[in-house]
Amino acid sequence: MNRKLIAVFLRIFKGLHMTQIIIDHNPSQEKLKELGVSSWSIWDCEPSKFPLDFGMTESAYVLEGEIRVTPQGGETVVIKAGDFVVFPKGLKSNWEVTKQLKKHYKHS
């Protein structure tokens, strides 16, 4: 069921030719459980700055920390602990990890 939900979610956004970062600042525990977020891989990063290009769509749930992400040609967004985020395939961005980052993530 988790894969079906993710597939539907991504199909909807791919149909819209998603080019922006999508942030849910207050996802419900039900949504996180349905997506199986707790079983996703975990990535940690110390405060730093670096470019990041997405070859695949990434869904992520931030457990700790804060990052400022600036999409190429777009406005900077701040992503914090508790946020659920979708970074679209093809996104070119610059990241500034301002507080030690820990996130669950999944590529599709």
Language model segments and positions:
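Conserved short histidine dyad/triad with adjacent acidic residue
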Residues: N26-S28, G36-G55, P88-K89
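Short histidine-centered beta-strand/loop micro-motifs
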Residues: K33-E34, F50-G55, P71, V77-V78, ...
